[in-house]
């Protein structure tokens, strides 16, 4: 019986559970999900990729990544998944009728983020704001890091905490700027 106690305690505590620790995800029905590990395989541009989460947070992607510190009105997901692999954060919005207040709030998260001193002289930080109409209809805002997705029905300041606590967590901690893709609305000032 004595040898069973640690196992029972482990089971009671969710010992083999890979869920995230309890955290206040703000309002807006926010939820954070850990996405099962998938290989970050490089695929030819234009290849159809099926990801295990929506929006995608890990897995196959194009060999090129998008230029950092930009707001993209449109960007193929396979580019921004590569940005995640490099330790970046992608802030997404889905507003078919437009949502300038939400977009401005996401841009403020990027503008007020600390300068990445490891990337000094290359980029301010490794963040993007991207419109993503492929997200589920009930998701207006998402924040994505390699292997982690926060989704919500509206903007909540929790987005900034998600970005701050998961920044530079990708398997390739690289500062190199990506390619300035078409669809970029603005570049963030240094």
Where are these regions (language model features)?
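Mid-length scaffold segments of soluble, non-membrane domains
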Residues: 73-120
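Bacterial signal peptide processing site
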Residues: 14-16
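C-terminal motif of bacterial Sec signal peptides marking the signal peptidase cleavage site
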Residues: 10-12
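Surface-exposed, low-hydrophobicity interaction/linker segments
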Residues: 20-81, 103
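Helix-rich interaction surfaces within compact, conserved domain-sized segments
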Residues: 112-190
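Sec-dependent signal peptide recognition
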Residues: 1-7
């Amino acid at each position: 019986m004595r040898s069973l106690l640690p196992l029972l305690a482990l089971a009671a505590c969710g010992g083999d559970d890979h869920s995230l620790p309890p955290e206040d995800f703000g309002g807006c029905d926010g939820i954070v999900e850990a996405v099962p590990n998938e290989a970050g395989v490089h695929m030819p541009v234009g290849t159809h990729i099926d990801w295990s989460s929506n929006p995608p947070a890990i897995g196959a992607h194009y060999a090129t990544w998008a230029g950092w510190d930009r707001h993209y009105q449109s960007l193929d997901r396979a580019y921004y998944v590569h940005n995640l692999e490099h330790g970046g954060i992608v802030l997404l919005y889905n507003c078919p009728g437009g949502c300038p207040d939400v977009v401005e709030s996401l841009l403020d998260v990027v503008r007020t983020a600390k300068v990445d001193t490891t990337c000094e002289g290359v980029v301010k930080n490794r963040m993007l704001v991207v419109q993503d109409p492929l997200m589920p209809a009930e998701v207006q805002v998402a924040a994505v890091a390699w292997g982690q997705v926060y989704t919500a029905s509206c903007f909540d300041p929790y987005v900034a905490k998600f970005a701050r606590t998961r920044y530079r967590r990708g398997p390739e901690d690289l500062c190199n700027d990506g390619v300035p893709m078409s669809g970029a609305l603005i570049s963030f000032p240094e």
